[in-house]
Curated annotation (Swiss-Prot):
General function of this protein: Catalyzes the methylthiolation of N6-(dimethylallyl)adenosine (i(6)A), leading to the formation of 2-methylthio-N6-(dimethylallyl)adenosine (ms(2)i(6)A) at position 37 in tRNAs that read codons beginning with uridine.
Residue span, Radical SAM core domain: 143-375
Subunit relationships: Monomer.
Residues in TRAM domain copies: 378-441
Native source organism of the sequence: Aliivibrio salmonicida (strain LFI1238) (Vibrio salmonicida (strain LFI1238))
Cofactor(s) needed by this chain: [4Fe-4S] cluster
Protein's recorded name: tRNA-2-methylthio-N(6)-dimethylallyladenosine synthase
Enzyme class, spelled out: transferase
Claim: Iron is one of the keywords in the record: yes
UniProt cofactor note: Binds 2 [4Fe-4S] clusters. One cluster is coordinated with 3 cysteines and an exchangeable S-adenosyl-L-methionine.
UniProt record similarity statement: Belongs to the methylthiotransferase family. MiaB subfamily.
Length: 474
């Protein structure tokens, strides 16, 4: 009888990527099939995030619900992974002793062995260590799930912003070897993937070892990925202003596959607050990066992250942030009221900002961003945009849904054969969360660039012989 696996995922795109790898790993090693019904699952895994407020309590509430299932089904395996597991592993083991497996983001590749061990062991099996790049060396070959794919190119963060737990839960920055990244993307391209989103906590800090001992920069990696035939759209997230050098800006000038949309977190427009956050840049330095980007790619749209009501934030500090939002003219944002993360320096900062003031500031910020976003959408009316067809429209299954490079969803009438292809659309209507358009041309009339076929890239990638000796064919 086939064993069933349920994975519940909270948090960032990196967690989504990790969860997909858990499913592939347990499917390949143990034949587990995914289910969405916890009652029929043999293994329940919770992939956690510690960024949001009350993350720990949210975990224990979910585990409490799963405990009722385990009481009725003693052989049920419950596992907790992700950043909360790394941060609170011992506490989880003490407060929820019925949890069988506790693993960190860097040890998910050991899940099959840990689950087997838990079945013959009454004690919780826990591994929240940081074995650097070992995780990627032990994952199964990638499986495409649609026309877009996430590919993790580096892990961790070495910036230590005062409010952030990532360096403590995912470790220091570690980059995957260049040929491993290219090999994974080439495999995905062979399976029909057209768009790749490169992932990392500080993705533009990538410094990947090459087969000859040199180091590949993030800018060079972008150009190499874009040259793979079939990969006609390239994104990356999340980037850091400190690592956004002129070499990356130059890629926007010469690499059309790189989208005209960038998520570049700034957190605040006040230099005083940025210093308290230990963000190694000023508001002017951030705007300088944006000016260079818009010179290289005039139509680029920018999104960002903002923390409102950071301890000590005055009304002037907040208005500095609002000025930055208007000056840069952000298209989107992820914005939240500050909430202290246990173990971070900012958790000990005194904060006397009234709760209503926090809510009012967040509402004002989000209203301004929404106003700007709506204006950008209206400006797209009667223009022609290239979009990747992702599947049927969620509003009307008789229509298709495509995504533009500036992250707008466009619904249009077209043949299902267009799914997985690029189309040019004339934008006819603008709504709050989407656009509507009509088909202008299909991919066969576009002349998309062909540089290196996926099979050629795979053949050029490092391989190991029976003795474990690695060779690389340049």
């Amino acid at each position: 009888m086939t064993k069933k696996l349920l994975i519940k995922t909270w948090g960032c795109q990196m967690n989504e990527y990790d969860s997909s790898k858990m499913a592939d790993l347990l499917g390949a090693a143990n034949g587990y099939e995914l289910t969405e019904d916890p009652k029929e699952a043999d293994v329940l895994l919770l992939n956690t995030c510690s960024i949001r407020e009350k993350a720990q309590e949210k975990v224990f509430h979910q585990l409490g619900r799963w405990k009722h299932l385990k009481d009725k089904k003693p052989d049920l395996v419950i596992g907790v992974g992700g950043c909360v597991a790394t941060q609170e592993g011992d506490h989880i083991r003490q407060r929820a002793p019925y949890v069988d497996v506790i693993f960190g983001p860097q040890t998910l590749h050991r899940l099959p062995q840990m689950i087997k061990q838990s079945l013959s062991n009454e004690k919780t099996v826990m591994d929240i260590s940081f074995p650097e790049i070992e995780k990627f060396d032990n994952l199964p070959e990638p499986k495409a799930d649609g026309v877009s794919a996430f590919v993790s190119i580096m892990e961790g963060c070495s910036k230590y912003c005062t409010y952030c737990v990532v360096p403590y839960t995912r470790g220091e920055e570690v980059s995957r070897p260049l040929d491993d990244v290219l090999f994974e993307i080439a495999q995905l391209a062979e399976q029909g993937v057209r768009e790749v989103n490169l992932l990392g906590q500080n993705v533009n800090a990538y410094r990947g070892p090459m087969y000859d001992g040199d180091i590949c920069s993030f800018a060079d990696l972008l150009r190499m990925v874009a040259s793979i035939d079939g990969i006609d759209r390239l994104r990356f997230t999340t980037s850091h202003p400190l690592e956004f050098g002129d070499d990356i800006v130059a890629v926007y000038e010469d690499t059309p596959e790189l989208v005209s949309f960038l998520h570049l977190p700034v957190q605040s427009g006040s230099d005083r607050i940025l210093t308290m956050m230990k963000r190694p840049h000023t508001a002017i330095e951030y705007k300088s990066i944006i000016r260079k980007l818009r010179k290289a790619r005039p139509d680029i749209l920018i999104s960002s992250d903002f923390i409102v009501a950071f301890p000590g934030e005055s009304e002037k500090d907040f208005q500095d942030t609002m000025k930055l939002i208007k000056d840069v003219d952000f298209d989107m944002s992820y914005s939240f009221v500050f909430s202290p993360r246990p173990g971070t320096p900012a958790a000990d900062y005194p904060c006397d900002i009234p709760e209503q003031t926090k809510k009012d500031r967040l509402a004002e910020l989000q209203q301004q961003i929404s106003f700007q976003s709506a204006r950008f959408s209206r400006q797209m009316l009667n223009t022609e945009l290239r979009a990747l067809v992702e599947g049927p429209s969620k509003r009307n299954p008789m229509e298709l849904r495509a995504r533009t490079e500036n992250n707008r969803v466009v619904n249009f009438t077209g043949s299902p054969e267009l799914i997985g292809q690029f189309v040019d659309l004339h934008i006819t209507e603008s709504f709050t969360n989407s656009l509507r358009g009509t088909l202008v041309r299909t991919e066969k009339d576009m002349g998309l660039r062909v540089a290196v076929s996926p099979s050629e890239m795979i053949e050029k990638t490092r391989r190991e012989d029976d003795l474990g000796v690695g060779t690389f064919t340049p």
